[in-house]
Amino acid sequence: MLKIGEFIYPWGSGHYSRMMRLNAIMGDYIKEKFEVHFSSKDHVYHKLLEKFPDHKDQIHQILMPTPIDGKFGPSILLSLINLLLPVSKNPPLVKQVTSYLREESKLYDKEKFDLVINDGDMGSNIIAKNRQIPSLFITNQFRPKLYRSRSYFYPALIFVSKQIEKASRILVADSPPPYTMCEYNLNFTKDVKEKVTYVGHFTTSVNIEKKAISDLEKLVENSEFGYWMRTGNRSTNDGTGQRYEQVFHQNEMKNEK
């Protein structure tokens, strides 16, 4: 039996949503019998337990390091302090990384995965590379373009991209060029482009039954409109919501729907 390890980064809900969509259709493409093991922490771990109550032995809690929450998303200052000092019940990041990689390595030793799929989890990506296990890395960013005022982040971005490119194949959750929405977050190097596949937005293909037109549909009918998907962590979503509220209450927006 083919054994697949799926490692889901627990920051926000986007990684979980994408992996569940992929997991739902894998049986259409993998013809031999297979078993999936999931790994994550916090709310994602509990969602997995609720979704797969009969497979709890295949759901593993791995304490993957995540940024420290601020008022409007991750706090850069607190996250930097957390590199060497404990913050908000989080041990120093150096200790977290060591512990989490050790736990993931033990899981690899125990389960003997034939294929690994990582959505946001670079640690597992590195382990798979070192053990010569075929791996997929799902992402919508590689080396994002930054404002000059944020150029000090480039060393970290280069480090992260180096870990992502260790995957056997990189799956971009977006449409291929020239219709790529997240193109400014990618900027793949020439040697990496050969292993990149654009796989779409992981949207559901379930047919929606047509019902009576809702008030929302009436509001946007025959109008140009946009929407925002809020799939980040709670503080990021709250901060984004507050900013949108401020914009929508400005005088320039009075005549807008």
Residue ranges and their predicted role:
Residues F7-W11, R18, A173-Y179, V199-E256:
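Active-site donor-nucleotide binding/catalytic segment of nucleotide-sugar enzymes
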Residues V44-K47, V116-R131:
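An aromatic- and histidine-rich active-site surface loop
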Residues L77-N118, M122:
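Conserved nucleotide-sugar donor-binding subdomain of glycosyltransferases
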